[in-house]
């Protein structure tokens, strides 16, 4: 009975911590190569909006990894997914810290984003471990591309946010490579397209609220 409840309790704990607790990083936030410069009000608002989008992405990452771990058939894979979730928690803390520093708020829709991502993670996990890993690899590839686009949009003066995004991009690429090495299956093109569409909706809405 206890072993049956363990994934449920883990998932519930992860949801509460992600949505309502102050995130704590195991690594210090990346230090910028140069001191931050002065930003105009419009630049600060845009930086805050972009980091809100990135924070939502990390909320979703927690949901995805937790859900996939809950239904993973291989105990080794389950442990790997939970480890990745813990590593992504650094990103959650860093982006929240930058939101606070920029005077911006997290998305008010975070519970909705979390629930949707958790559902997707359950579906992906139920498809079997190779496809679940394929979902991880494709998600991380798309996130990496998304972060690269943000480096082109963040104000040059916001070196603190840029340092965070650059390190996140490195970490996401590593997670994608680890999923592939673990036996990820290539997802069908329609699945990738749907993932990009869902991501576009999320980023567009989260940029505003």
Swiss-Prot record:
Where are the residues of the annotated region Disordered?
A: 23-42
InterPro entries documented for this protein: COQ7_proteobact (IPR047809), Ferritin-like (IPR012347), Ferritin-like_SF (IPR009078), Ubq_synth_Coq7 (IPR011566)
Alphabetical GO CC annotations of the entry are:
plasma membrane
Membrane topology type:
Peripheral membrane protein
Q: What is its main location?
A: membrane
Please tell me which top-level EC class this enzyme sits in: oxidoreductase
Q: Quick check: keyword Membrane in the entry?
A: yes
What's the name of the protein? Answer: 3-demethoxyubiquinol 3-hydroxylase
Residues involved in Fe cation 1 binding: 58, 88, 91, 172
Give the record's pathway. Cofactor biosynthesis; ubiquinone biosynthesis
Q: Which residues cross the membrane?
A: none
The free-text note explaining how the cofactor binds reads: Binds 2 iron ions per subunit.
Q: Which GO terms describe its molecular function?
A: 3-demethoxyubiquinol 3-hydroxylase activity; metal ion binding
Which protein family is named in the record?
Belongs to the COQ7 family.
Q: Which residues bind Fe cation 2?
A: 88, 140, 172, 175
Q: Which domain of life is it from?
A: Bacteria
For this protein, the record's SUPFAM superfamilies field holds: Ferritin-like
Q: Name its cellular compartments.
A: Cell membrane
EC number in record: 1.14.99.60
- Keyword annotations of the record: Cell membrane, Iron, Membrane, Metal-binding, Monooxygenase, Oxidoreductase, Ubiquinone biosynthesis
Which residue ranges have biased composition labelled Low complexity? 23-36
An example Gene Ontology biological process: ubiquinone biosynthetic process
Q: Main role?
A: Catalyzes the hydroxylation of 2-nonaprenyl-3-methyl-6-methoxy-1,4-benzoquinol during ubiquinone biosynthesis.
Q: Which reaction does it catalyse?
A: a 5-methoxy-2-methyl-3-(all-trans-polyprenyl)benzene-1,4-diol + AH2 + O2 = a 3-demethylubiquinol + A + H2O
Cofactor(s) this protein requires:
Fe cation
């Amino acid at each position: 009975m206890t072993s049956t409840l363990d994934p449920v309790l883990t998932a519930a704990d992860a949801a509460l911590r992600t949505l309502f607790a102050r995130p704590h990083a195991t690594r210090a936030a990346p230090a910028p190569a140069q001191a931050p410069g002065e930003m105009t009000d419009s630049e600060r608002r845009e930086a805050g909006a972009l980091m809100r989008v990135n924070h939502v992405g990390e909320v979703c990452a927690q949901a995805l990894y937790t859900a996939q771990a809950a239904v993973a058939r291989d105990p080794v894979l389950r442990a790997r997914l939970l480890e990745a979730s813990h590593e992504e928690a650094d990103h959650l803390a860093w982006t929240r810290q930058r939101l606070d520093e920029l005077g911006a708020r997290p998305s008010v829709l975070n519970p909705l984003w979390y629930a949707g991502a958790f559902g997707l993670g359950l579906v992906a996990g139920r498809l079997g471990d190779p496809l679940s890993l394929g979902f991880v690899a494709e998600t991380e590839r798309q996130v990496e591309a998304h972060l690269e686009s943000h480096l082109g949009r963040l104000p040059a003066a916001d070196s603190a946010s840029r340092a965070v995004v650059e390190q996140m991009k490195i970490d996401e690429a590593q997670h994608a490579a680890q999923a592939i090495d673990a036996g990820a299956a290539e997802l069908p093109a329609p699945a990738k397209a749907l993932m990009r569409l869902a991501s576009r909706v999320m980023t567009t809405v989260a940029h505003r609220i």
